[in-house]
Protein backbone atom coordinates (compact mmCIF):
# COMPACT_ATOMS: atom_id res chain seq x y z
CA UNK A 1 0.00 0.00 0.00
CA UNK A 2 1.17 3.50 -0.89
CA UNK A 3 -0.31 5.31 2.11
CA UNK A 4 -1.66 4.82 5.63
CA UNK A 5 -5.16 5.19 4.16
CA UNK A 6 -4.54 2.33 1.72
CA UNK A 7 -2.84 0.23 4.38
CA UNK A 8 -5.79 0.49 6.78
CA UNK A 9 -8.27 -0.30 3.99
CA UNK A 10 -6.29 -3.44 3.15
CA UNK A 11 -6.13 -4.42 6.83
CA UNK A 12 -9.92 -4.06 6.96
CA UNK A 13 -10.27 -6.42 4.00
CA UNK A 14 -8.03 -9.01 5.69
CA UNK A 15 -10.17 -8.79 8.83
CA UNK A 16 -13.39 -9.19 6.83
CA UNK A 17 -11.99 -12.26 5.06
CA UNK A 18 -11.41 -13.91 8.45
CA UNK A 19 -15.19 -13.91 9.00
CA UNK A 20 -16.80 -17.34 9.10
CA UNK A 21 -19.40 -17.50 6.38
CA UNK A 22 -19.95 -15.66 3.11
CA UNK A 23 -18.06 -12.39 2.70
CA UNK A 24 -18.38 -9.69 0.08
CA UNK A 25 -15.88 -6.84 -0.17
CA UNK A 26 -16.47 -3.85 -2.43
CA UNK A 27 -13.70 -1.51 -3.50
CA UNK A 28 -15.10 1.71 -4.89
CA UNK A 29 -14.85 5.48 -5.24
CA UNK A 30 -18.45 6.59 -4.87
CA UNK A 31 -19.96 10.05 -4.56
CA UNK A 32 -23.27 11.35 -3.35
CA UNK A 33 -25.08 13.80 -1.13
CA UNK A 34 -25.63 12.86 2.49
CA UNK A 35 -28.52 15.02 3.72
CA UNK A 36 -27.08 14.89 7.25
CA UNK A 37 -23.47 15.84 6.51
CA UNK A 38 -21.54 18.29 4.37
CA UNK A 39 -18.48 16.03 4.15
CA UNK A 40 -18.40 14.85 0.56
CA UNK A 41 -16.57 15.80 -2.60
CA UNK A 42 -19.82 16.33 -4.50
CA UNK A 43 -21.32 18.57 -1.82
CA UNK A 44 -18.08 20.60 -1.68
CA UNK A 45 -18.11 21.13 -5.47
CA UNK A 46 -21.78 22.12 -5.60
CA UNK A 47 -21.53 24.41 -2.57
CA UNK A 48 -18.52 26.21 -4.05
CA UNK A 49 -20.16 26.49 -7.47
CA UNK A 50 -23.43 27.86 -6.10
CA UNK A 51 -21.50 30.42 -4.07
CA UNK A 52 -19.32 31.35 -7.08
CA UNK A 53 -16.08 30.32 -5.33
CA UNK A 54 -13.28 29.27 -7.63
CA UNK A 55 -11.96 25.75 -7.16
CA UNK A 56 -8.90 23.70 -7.94
CA UNK A 57 -9.24 20.62 -10.12
CA UNK A 58 -6.35 18.17 -10.14
CA UNK A 59 -5.42 17.16 -13.66
CA UNK A 60 -3.12 14.32 -12.66
CA UNK A 61 -5.41 12.50 -10.20
CA UNK A 62 -7.50 9.88 -11.98
CA UNK A 63 -10.34 7.77 -10.65
CA UNK A 64 -13.40 5.82 -11.82
CA UNK A 65 -16.27 7.38 -9.85
CA UNK A 66 -19.73 5.91 -9.41
CA UNK A 67 -22.78 7.43 -7.77
CA UNK A 68 -24.17 6.18 -4.48
CA UNK A 69 -27.29 5.19 -6.46
CA UNK A 70 -25.33 2.87 -8.77
CA UNK A 71 -23.42 1.45 -5.82
CA UNK A 72 -26.72 0.60 -4.09
CA UNK A 73 -27.87 -1.16 -7.28
CA UNK A 74 -24.70 -3.28 -7.26
CA UNK A 75 -25.03 -4.13 -3.57
CA UNK A 76 -28.67 -5.11 -4.05
CA UNK A 77 -27.74 -7.31 -7.02
CA UNK A 78 -24.89 -8.92 -5.08
CA UNK A 79 -27.22 -9.64 -2.17
CA UNK A 80 -29.99 -11.06 -4.39
CA UNK A 81 -27.51 -13.26 -6.30
CA UNK A 82 -25.56 -14.25 -3.15
CA UNK A 83 -22.31 -13.04 -4.70
CA UNK A 84 -19.26 -13.25 -2.50
CA UNK A 85 -15.65 -12.25 -2.96
CA UNK A 86 -13.82 -9.03 -3.68
CA UNK A 87 -15.27 -6.77 -6.37
CA UNK A 88 -14.17 -3.41 -7.72
CA UNK A 89 -17.12 -1.13 -8.45
CA UNK A 90 -16.04 1.76 -10.64
CA UNK A 91 -17.16 3.39 -13.84
CA UNK A 92 -16.04 1.58 -16.99
CA UNK A 93 -14.17 4.72 -17.99
CA UNK A 94 -12.20 7.16 -15.88
CA UNK A 95 -11.65 10.87 -15.44
CA UNK A 96 -9.36 13.21 -13.62
CA UNK A 97 -10.58 15.36 -10.74
CA UNK A 98 -10.58 18.49 -12.93
CA UNK A 99 -12.96 16.86 -15.42
CA UNK A 100 -15.20 15.68 -12.58
CA UNK A 101 -15.40 19.15 -11.00
CA UNK A 102 -16.09 20.71 -14.41
CA UNK A 103 -18.80 18.14 -15.23
CA UNK A 104 -20.55 18.73 -11.90
CA UNK A 105 -20.56 22.51 -12.44
CA UNK A 106 -21.86 22.03 -16.00
CA UNK A 107 -24.48 19.54 -14.78
CA UNK A 108 -25.92 21.97 -12.24
CA UNK A 109 -25.61 24.92 -14.61
CA UNK A 110 -23.26 26.83 -12.31
CA UNK A 111 -20.27 28.15 -14.26
CA UNK A 112 -17.32 28.92 -12.00
CA UNK A 113 -13.57 29.30 -12.42
CA UNK A 114 -11.77 25.98 -12.02
CA UNK A 115 -7.99 26.09 -11.80
CA UNK A 116 -6.08 23.29 -13.50
CA UNK A 117 -3.72 21.98 -10.83
CA UNK A 118 -1.01 19.32 -10.92
CA UNK A 119 -0.42 17.75 -7.51
CA UNK A 120 3.07 17.02 -6.37
CA UNK A 121 3.10 14.41 -3.64
CA UNK A 122 6.00 12.66 -2.04
CA UNK A 123 5.94 9.30 -0.26
CA UNK A 124 5.84 10.94 3.18
CA UNK A 125 2.77 13.06 2.43
CA UNK A 126 0.96 10.72 0.03
CA UNK A 127 -2.70 10.40 0.96
CA UNK A 128 -4.03 8.84 -2.23
CA UNK A 129 -2.25 7.77 -5.38
CA UNK A 130 -2.49 9.88 -8.54
CA UNK A 131 -4.01 6.91 -10.38
CA UNK A 132 -6.75 5.08 -8.49
CA UNK A 133 -8.82 3.82 -11.42
CA UNK A 134 -10.54 0.53 -10.61
CA UNK A 135 -11.00 -2.28 -13.11
CA UNK A 136 -14.56 -3.62 -12.91
CA UNK A 137 -13.94 -6.57 -15.25
CA UNK A 138 -14.71 -9.13 -12.52
CA UNK A 139 -17.99 -7.35 -11.78
CA UNK A 140 -18.88 -7.37 -15.50
CA UNK A 141 -18.44 -11.15 -15.41
CA UNK A 142 -21.28 -11.61 -12.91
CA UNK A 143 -23.73 -8.81 -13.78
CA UNK A 144 -24.47 -6.26 -16.45
CA UNK A 145 -22.13 -3.35 -15.75
CA UNK A 146 -21.48 -0.64 -18.33
CA UNK A 147 -21.71 2.52 -16.23
CA UNK A 148 -19.90 5.52 -17.70
CA UNK A 149 -18.97 8.18 -15.16
CA UNK A 150 -20.42 11.14 -17.08
CA UNK A 151 -23.79 9.46 -17.76
CA UNK A 152 -24.02 8.31 -14.14
CA UNK A 153 -23.17 11.80 -12.87
CA UNK A 154 -25.83 13.40 -15.09
CA UNK A 155 -28.47 10.95 -13.85
CA UNK A 156 -27.44 11.53 -10.23
CA UNK A 157 -27.50 15.32 -10.51
CA UNK A 158 -30.97 15.19 -12.09
CA UNK A 159 -32.37 13.15 -9.16
CA UNK A 160 -30.26 14.39 -6.27
CA UNK A 161 -31.14 14.44 -2.57
CA UNK A 162 -31.50 17.83 -0.88
CA UNK A 163 -28.46 19.49 0.63
CA UNK A 164 -27.74 19.42 4.36
CA UNK A 165 -29.44 22.13 6.37
CA UNK A 166 -27.22 24.89 7.74
Regions found by a protein language model. Name each.
Residues 148-166:
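Amphipathic terminal alpha-helices
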Residues 3, 63-66, 95, 134, ...:
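Residue-level signal for the nucleotide or nucleotide-sugar donor/cofactor binding architecture
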Residues 57-62, 87-95, 141:
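Glycine-rich Rossmann NAD(P)(H)-binding loop
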Residues 14-63, 70:
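NAD(P)-dependent short-chain dehydrogenase/reductase
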Residues 8:
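Active-site helix of classical SDR
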Residues 74, 81-124, 130, 164-166:
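Mid/C-terminal beta-alpha module of Rossmann-like enzyme folds, strongest
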Residues 69-77, 154:
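Amphipathic alpha-helical segments that line or abut small-molecule/effector binding pockets
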Residues 121-142, 146:
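A hydrophobic C-terminal alpha-helical subdomain
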Amino acid sequence: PLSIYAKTKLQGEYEALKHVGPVSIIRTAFYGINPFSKKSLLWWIIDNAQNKREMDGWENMYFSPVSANKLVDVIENMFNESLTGIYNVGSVDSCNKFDFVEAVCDGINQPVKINRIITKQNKETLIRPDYSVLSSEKLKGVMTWNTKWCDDLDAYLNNMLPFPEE
